[in-house]
Every structure is written in C-alpha cells, then in structure tokens.
Amino acid sequence: MTTLAMLLTLADSRLPTGAHVHSGGVEEAITAGLVTNLSSLEAFLKRRIRSHGLVTASIAAAVQRGDLAPDGADRETDARTPSPAARDASRSQGRGLVRLARAIWPEADWDALGAKPHLAVAAGRVGALAGLTPEHLALQLVYTTMTGSATAAQRLLALDPTDVAVLTFQLSELCTTTAAEAAIGLADLSDPLLDTLAQHHAERERPLFAS
C-alpha cells in the first residue's frame, strides 16, 4: 500500500477503532446550548482543531519521530488533559486503534504501549509503521478530530449533510496549518471549556455518545 493510500485509509471513519461512538464534546456542547446551528458548529470545530487536535497531533508526531517514548508520551498527554473523562475517551480510542493495528502489524511490540494507551501514543506508533511523515500523521489526526465532531453534530442537530460537508472543506486549510504546527514540536496547551464539557458529559445520564 502506498503512503497516500495508507493516509486515506487511516482517515476513513469506517475503520473499526470505536471512534464513531465519540462526539469529541459536541454532544455536550449541544446539550448546553453552545452549538445550535452551522455557525456555532463552525466555532466549536475551530476551537477543537486549535486545541485538542493540535495537542494530540503534536504528541503523535513526536512518538512517530522517536522523540518521545510511549511512557513519556503517555505522561505528556495526561499533563495536557486535565479532565479524567477526556483522558478516558482518549485511552478508549487508543485501545481501539491498537486492536486494529495488531491485526495489520502483528509483528510489532504493541504490549510496550500498555493496555490502554492514549490515542496520540497509539497513533504515533501506527504512523511510524505505516511509513507516514510526521506532517501526514498530524494531518490525519487533526482532520479526524474535526470530522468526528462534525458528523456527530450533523446527526444530533439534523443538519443538512451537504452544509456540513461544505463546512469541513472550508476548515481544511486550518487543519493543514494546524498539522504543520503540530509536526514541528510539542504543543503545550489545553482548553478549559472542552475539558468541562467532557466531564459534564461523563456525569450525565444516558448520553448518546461515549464522549
């Protein structure tokens, strides 16, 4: 498989990694009245790309380059994820990615990542095995950070799929520039609003999405 084909495959929302059950906080944002239409969804997605997307992609790129060992990357992710609920969501998605990766690269030492690695840690190892550049790996993570929340909002708000697709096209340049920044070095930030939404979501009864 070529590098481009590998990149497109990893960005495919149909991959059986469990990512489809996570809304990236947009369900709670909708419940709180912060996201109500396409315009407010755009603002939410921009915020998520510039914070969670940037941080996750930067740690994954560092793992891919070999600048961070898995245990160090795990600690760096925890330090940038104050919300326990957000950490749990990250580890759930990381475990799902490793489950798939074991089937694709069975010869790799996946046990070194631990039982429930953060998504960034698992993605960094996958990116290295797939032969992706740090820039391409970062772009894949930033892009799926955006599209996961966009798709969830489309379902929850019954938005026109075409309108949401147009919005994701419009945000593609932001994804590209954010990925380029992430590939340079570790991003050191968090977003209190997104952390609060994640925690409230975990404490709410019967949410539709896992996060």
From Swiss-Prot:
Entry similarity comment: Belongs to the UreF family.
Keywords in alphabetical order: Chaperone, Cytoplasm, Nickel insertion
GO molecular function, one term: nickel cation binding
Organism whose genome encodes this protein: Mycobacterium marinum (strain ATCC BAA-535 / M)
Protein's UniProt keywords contain Nucleotide-binding: no
InterPro entries named in the record: UreF, UreF_sf
tRNA processing listed as a keyword: no
Subcellular location: Cytoplasm
Function statement: Required for maturation of urease via the functional incorporation of the urease nickel metallocenter.
UniProt subunit comment: UreD, UreF and UreG form a complex that acts as a GTP-hydrolysis-dependent molecular chaperone, activating the urease apoprotein by helping to assemble the nickel containing metallocenter of UreC. The UreE protein probably delivers the nickel.
Region annotation (Disordered) ranges: 68-93
Protein known as: Urease accessory protein UreF
Primary site of residence: cytoplasm
GO cellular component: cytoplasm
Pfam (any one): UreF
